[in-house]
């Protein structure tokens, strides 16, 4: 797998879960002899919602909610076959979305 690159994008609502998952991926890749670039923190997406609390009138009474989506990027340069096998066997947290691309 010479001149290959594995790019891993992680998304999660909880920053602790995503940091724990990135640490596991980086540790696994380094243990198998691959060179790792990252984790690179990407911009956090903040979605805000405003909801009227009153069912009929009184527009001044509102609640505001926010969802934050945290993202990380990891590049694994020159992965070995052991690296790919170890990453496939890796069990990550349930709240983390993983996208893997080969380049």
UniProtKB/Swiss-Prot annotation:
PROSITE patterns: RIBOSOMAL_S10. Keywords: Ribonucleoprotein, Ribosomal protein. GO terms for cellular component: ribonucleoprotein complex; ribosome. One of its GO terms (molecular function) is tRNA binding. The keyword Ribosomal protein applies. One of its GO terms (biological process) is translation. It comes from the Bacteria. Pfam families: Ribosomal_S10. HAMAP family: Ribosomal_uS10. NCBIfam families: PRK00596.1 (NF001861), rpsJ_bact (TIGR01049). Involved in the binding of tRNA to the ribosomes. Belongs to the universal ribosomal protein uS10 family. Part of the 30S ribosomal subunit. This is Small ribosomal subunit protein uS10. It comes from Photobacterium profundum (strain SS9).
């Amino acid at each position: 797998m010479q001149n290959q690159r594995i790019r891993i994008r992680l998304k999660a609502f909880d920053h602790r879960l995503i940091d724990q998952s990135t640490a596991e991926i980086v540790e696994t890749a380094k243990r198998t002899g691959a060179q790792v670039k990252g984790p690179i923190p990407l911009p956090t997406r903040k979605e805000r919602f405003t909801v009227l609390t009153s069912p009929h009138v009184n527009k001044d009474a509102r609640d505001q909610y926010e969802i934050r989506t945290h993202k990380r990027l990891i590049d694994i340069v020159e992965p070995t076959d052991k690296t790919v096998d170890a990453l496939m066997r890796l069990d990550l947290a349930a709240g983390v979305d993983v996208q893997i691309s080969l380049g």
